[in-house]
Amino acid sequence: MSKKLISIVDVKDYVGQEVTIGAWVANKSGKGKIAFVQLRDGSAFFQGVAFKPNFIEKYGEESGLEKFDVIKRLNQETSVYVTGIVKEDERSKFGYELDITDLEVIGESHEYPITPKEHGTDFLMDNRHLWLRSRKQMAVMQIRNAIIYSTYEFFDQNGFIKFDSPILSENAAEDSTELFETDYFGKPAFLSQSGQLYLEAGAMALGRVFDFGPVFRAEKSKTRRHLTEFWMMDAEYSFLSHEESLDLQEAYVKALIQGVLDRAPQALDILERDVEALKRYIAEPFKRVSYDDAITLLQEHEADEDTDYEHLEHGDDFGSPHETWISNYFGVPTFVVNYPASFKAFYMKPVPGNPERVLCADLLAPEGYGEIIGGSMREDDYDALVAKMDELGMDKSEYDFYLDLRKYGSVPHGGFGIGIERMVTFVAGTKHIREAIPFPRMLHRIKP
C-alpha cells in the first residue's frame, strides 16, 4: 500500500477527492448491486458504499466482480485499506460518505465474538480487549482522552508544574486498611493510595504542583463507583486560601467539561449525553453548602415522597443516596464543606474556632454521580499536626519527612484530588465506572 492514508475524522477536508483510509469493518449490509460497509479507524466511524456497476465499469467484468465479491464477503473486524471518493451526505450522522472505488484486505477476521446482538456484562468484560472497539466504548475512551489533555492544559495555564510522586511507599496517605502490600527487598511496602504527601513537599519547593498517575485502594467494594486501580490527579499549592482553592477546583472541573465539548463532541453524541446539561454546569456557579447545613437539609426533607436515604445526625458521614440527593437538590455540582474531623484524614486543618470541623470540601456531581473531588487545607503547624497524630496513635517515625515540611518554613497550603474515572463517568453519562478505564480492576476482576 503506497498511497497516503488519512484519518476518518479528517474526511471533511477531502470532499470530492479520492482518499485511502486504513480501517476495520465494524459492520456490513446490503444486497444485490450495492454493499454498505461501516468503517472505523479509532478517530471516528464512517460509512462506505460500493456499487457493483461502478466496479465493473472501472476494472472490467471479471476483475470488477471479483473485487465487489471481496467487499460482499467481508467479516466484522476485518482490517482493510479502502479507497474512494468522499461525498457529503446529510442522511449520515457523520455528514459524509465514501463512494468506494477499491478495497484491499489486510487482516482477515473470523467468528468475531462480539456480534451486533446484546451481550451480558460478564461476557463483555471477559472480552474487554475487543469490547473497546465498539462505538460506545470508543466514545468513552475519547472523552477520557479529552479530560486528560484538558487536565495538563489547565494546570500549565495556571502555573502548576508536573511533579511525579512515587507509587511505592512505606506509609499510607490516609486509611492503612485499604493498602496493597508488597515485598520490597525484605521490607513491607505499599502501592500508593495518593501522591498527596509527596506533593506537599513539591509545593514547598515549587509553589504549585500536580501529579497524574495510577493509585490503588484495596477496598472490598462492588459498587458502580469503585475500582481497586484507578487514575488520580492530585494538586497541591502554597499560599492559597480555602475559598481560593474552591475557586480553582470549580474552574478546573468546568475546564474539563469544556474540553470534552470542544474535543469530543461526536463521542457525546454517540453516547446520547445531555449536552445542554453539561453547558449549564459550565455557565452556572457551583453551589457551596456546609456539612452541617447539608445534614439539616437532609433531615428536613427525609419524609418527602421522592427521598430514599437513611436518617443522619450531625456527625454522621454521607452515603451515596445522601450525596445523590444533595447534588440533585441544587441541580449543579455542589461543594459540601467543613466536614467533622472525626472521619476525615489526620492532615486536614481545623476550621478556625471550631476544632470539630475541618477546612475541607467534597465536590458532588449531579445526576447521581456523587463525589468526584476531595480536597482540604493541610495542617501547617508542626505542634498541632504532632498532637493530632498522637491522638490517633500514629507512628510519627513513618512520617518524618512529612513532619519536616512543618519545621522549615511552613506556609498555608492545601490541595485536592480527582479520580479521573469518576469524572469520565459523569461527563460521559455512563452508568458504571468500569467503562471509564480501558482495563478495569475490581474486587473480582484482574484480567484481561
Swiss-Prot record:
Alphabetical UniProt keywords: Aminoacyl-tRNA synthetase, ATP-binding, Cytoplasm, Ligase, Nucleotide-binding, Protein biosynthesis
Catalyzed reactions: tRNA(Asn) + L-asparagine + ATP = L-asparaginyl-tRNA(Asn) + AMP + diphosphate + H(+)
Keyword presence, Ligase: yes
Stretches assigned to coiled coil: none
SUPFAM superfamilies in the cross-refs: Class II aaRS and biotin synthetases, Nucleic acid-binding proteins
Disulfide bond annotation, renumbered to this chain: none
Alphabetized InterPro entries for the sequence: Aa-tRNA-synt_II, aa-tRNA-synth_II, aa-tRNA-synth_II/BPL/LPL, Asn-tRNA-ligase, Asp/Asn-tRNA-synth_IIb, NA-bd_OB-fold, NA-bd_OB_tRNA
Enzyme Commission number: 6.1.1.22
Family from the record: Belongs to the class-II aminoacyl-tRNA synthetase family.
Name this polypeptide is given: Asparagine--tRNA ligase
Organism (species): Streptococcus agalactiae serotype V (strain ATCC BAA-611 / 2603 V/R)
